[in-house]
Amino acid sequence: MVTNDSLLSRLLPGLLVAAAIFAAWWLFIRAGDHPSVPNQAPGLLDAPSSVGPMLLQASQLGPTYDQSAQDTRATTSVEIRKGQSPAATKIIAHTWKAGARAGWSQVHGSITVLSRAELFTGSDLNAVSAGFERQMIHTYHGKPATAPGPLPGQHGWLLQGTTVSQIYSTLYTARRQVAVYGWQHGDVLAIVVVTGLPRDGVLQAATTLANAQDQNIGFVTRG
């Protein structure tokens, strides 16, 4: 005859397994919907910002791109002055208000995008824009490029180059094509940087995205 203690010792492992399964099921139900990709960490565009709406937005990049929390942030006062001439530094000191950038990368592709905007209180910004252009030439070994279509803004400059940055080579091939377009829209300086493989057509992508961002800037400044 089986004693109560013996019966309990036989049933206990099964009861523990059943309890664990029930707990896991309950947590799953309480969690609700489970997207196939992790939720993006909050970044600059999730908080109120005078410059954030001037950047490219998620709806313009589409669902095939993920936003980088690391590359989506406000511009610091040190960054805005880096590599600038004394004349440009003076303009920045007196008229720069705020800046921001947003980074993106294809989930199942090779393109990365950086969208940047800097807001000033004046429109005499040629010296500052020239400083940005010099930085891009140095960073990407850039050379003037011919636009494949209409480009927005005033005093624009279009560069094509390459990068061997470790930021990209950890994910993609070490040598990548780069297209950079910088322009002025009133009291805003904007830059779009697109990197990719030869098949990606980075010049065309940069042209298309620059026009999209310029529409955002126009909408914000008119509002």
Language model segments and positions:
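Short, low-complexity patches enriched in S/T/P/G
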Residues: 1-11
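Hydrophobic membrane-insertion alpha-helices, especially the h-region
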Residues: 12-30
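N-terminal "mature-domain start" segment
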Residues: 30-105, 143-152, 160-163, 214-223
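Extracytoplasmic/secreted envelope proteins and their assembly/folding machinery
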Residues: 48, 52-58, 62, 117, ...
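A short, solvent-exposed beta-edge/loop patch
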Residues: 60-61, 145-223
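A short acidic-to-branched-hydrophobic micro-motif
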Residues: 93-131
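Short, solvent-exposed aromatic-acidic interface loops
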Residues: 132-136, 195-198
